[in-house]
Each structure stands twice: as structure tokens, then as C-alpha cells.
């Protein structure tokens, strides 16, 4: 079995994931299907005799996310529109756990928990995944920003239906990241962000096709809906590097209001 096949089909113990990550072991599809029966329509036995999912089917991935969020985090209602970014839950959980370790460094090695820990998610998307995991794992309170009105609407619906009390704020001016979001008297312990990676729509499309070709071995035209994402979720002028530089430059104005 190739390394690529292993990573996609086997889902053995994921040694590179954070020790506190709930997704360190192979997906238990029996339990996940019990949470979300429709997921069973997308689970099959591969040539190695292992239960697996078609991770290039956007609906299958969304159903997997729904089941993982319900089984591991108690999230009963989670849905996003077709064409919006559907993030891998294990990787996003890893981010939150390492962020918790970062906060522990300023707290005598103890991870701070509870609503007194205030976090800011820049560009939360329709999925609102960082605030969900941060709330469920550590009970942190969250403000989450987004420039896309439809994403805000969906994220608010997720928050309300699961009683998460996430404060979702629309960024009305896409030139800014923190301006218009952080209030004058607000203090945040942590800022998280999954920035747009690509520098243009063409870059995003090319990356999508490369992933399909390299990981699935199919011609690009055979599967063109594998990786979701709105343009603001996938690309911005100058790409990830430009976004982060802008973020750093603007953060100077809030150096006394944000710890990390």
C-alpha cells in the first residue's frame, strides 16, 4: 500500500495529531453511522478490507463531519450550503488543542478553561468550526468574524440551534481584518484564523485539479466538485502571505487588546 493510500483509506492511529485530539484513531464507522444513518450510503470496503469513505465526495465529507460533531462534541445540528468550505474536523481540532497549549504557557502550564477565556476567529466561514470545537472542548467564549453575509447567516443558525452563544460579526469592509470587529473595550486571549491560501481563483482551481489527480489518480474532469469553498474562503489578492502580512500590520493597533 502506498503512503497516499494509507492516509486516505486506513485512518490508523494518527501519531502526528495532538494527544488530546479525539480523532487519533481510525474512524469507527459503525458508531458514526448510528449517529448519521445516511453516512452509511457512502461507506464501502476497499481492496485492503478496510471500511472507508470517498473523501472526494463533498456530500460524503459533510455527512462525516455531521456525524463526528454529533458523536464527539454533542453538536446535533450542523449543516452548510453546497459549495462552501467543509473543513476536516481532525485537523481543525488539532489547531485548537495546540492553541490551548499556547495559552497554558501564560498560565503556569495549566490550560485555562471557561467563558472567561475570550477568543476571536477571523473568517469563521459558514462552518464555524473553530468556535464549535473551542467551546465544546474548553468552554471558551467566542467572537467570530466573516465578510460573507450568507456564511454569517448559516453560522448563526448553527450557534443558535446548538445553544453555543457564539458572537458572530459581519466585517462590512473587506480591506480590514480587526478594524470594525474588535470593540474599543474588548480584550481577547487568543486569535485564530484559517486564512485564504491562494492568490487567485486560477490558483485555487489549479490546486483543486492537482489534488484530484495526485490523490485519486483520476483525470480532473472526472471529479470537479470535490473541494468546496467560496472565493473568500479559498483565495485573496496576494494569497496567504499577503493576508498574514496585513493581519500583522493591523494587529499593531490592537497590541494591548489581544494576548495571542
Task: Show which residues each predicted segment covers.
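Conserved alpha-helix/loop element of class I SAM-dependent methyltransferases that forms part
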Residues: 68-72, 90-118
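N-terminal auxiliary segments of SAM/dcSAM-dependent transferases
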Residues: 1-86
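Glycine-rich phosphate/diphosphate-binding loop of Rossmann-like nucleotide-binding domains
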Residues: 139-147
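S-adenosylmethionine
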Residues: 147-149, 161, 165-260
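Phosphate/oxyanion-binding active-site loops and adjacent basic polyanion-contact surfaces
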Residues: 60, 87-94, 236-243
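Conserved class I S-adenosyl-L-methionine
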Residues: 112-126, 142-143
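Conserved SAM-binding loop
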Residues: 155-156
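Conserved SAM-binding loop of SAM-dependent methyltransferases across substrates and taxa
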Residues: 126-140
Amino acid at each position: 500500500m502506498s503512503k497516499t493510500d494509507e492516509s486516505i483509506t486506513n485512518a490508523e492511529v494518527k501519531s502526528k495529531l495532538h494527544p488530546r485530539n479525539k480523532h487519533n484513531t481510525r474512524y469507527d464507522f459503525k458508531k458514526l453511522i448510528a449517529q448519521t444513518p445516511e453516512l452509511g450510503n457512502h461507506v464501502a470496503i476497499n481492496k485492503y478490507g478496510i471500511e472507508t469513505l470517498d473523501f472526494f465526495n463533498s456530500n460524503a465529507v459533510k455527512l462525516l463531519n455531521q456525524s463526528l460533531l454529533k458523536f464527539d462534541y454533542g453538536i446535533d445540528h450542523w449543516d452548510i450550503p453546497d459549495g462552501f468550505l467543509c473543513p476536516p474536523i481532525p485537523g481543525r481540532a488539532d489547531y485548537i488543542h495546540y492553541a490551548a497549549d499556547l495559552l497554558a504557557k501564560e498560565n503556569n502550564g495549566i490550560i485555562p478553561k471557561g467563558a472567561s477565556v475570550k477568543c476571536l476567529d477571523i473568517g469563521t466561514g459558514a462552518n464555524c468550526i473553530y468556535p464549535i470545537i473551542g467551546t465544546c472542548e474548553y468552554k471558551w467564549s467566542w467572537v467570530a468574524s466573516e465578510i460573507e453575509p450568507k456564511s454569517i447567516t448559516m453560522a448563526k443558525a448553527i450557534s443558535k440551534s446548538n445553544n453555543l452563544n457564539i458572537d458572530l460579526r459581519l466585517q462590512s469592509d473587506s480591506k480590514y481584518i480587526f478594524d470594525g470587529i474588535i470593540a474599543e473595550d474588548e480584550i481577547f486571549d487568543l486569535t485564530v484564523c484559517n486564512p485564504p491560501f491562494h492568490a487567485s481563483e486560477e490558483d485555487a482551481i489549479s490546486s483543486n485539479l492537482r489534488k484530484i489527480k495526485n490523490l485519486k489518480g483520476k483525470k480532473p474532469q472526472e471529479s470537479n466538485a470535490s473541494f468546496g469553498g467560496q472565493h473568500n474562503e479559498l483565495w485573496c489578492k496576494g494569497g496567504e502571505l499577503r493576508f498574514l502580512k496585513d493581519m500583522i500590520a493591523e494587529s499593531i493597533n490592537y497590541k494591548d487588546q489581544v494576548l495571542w
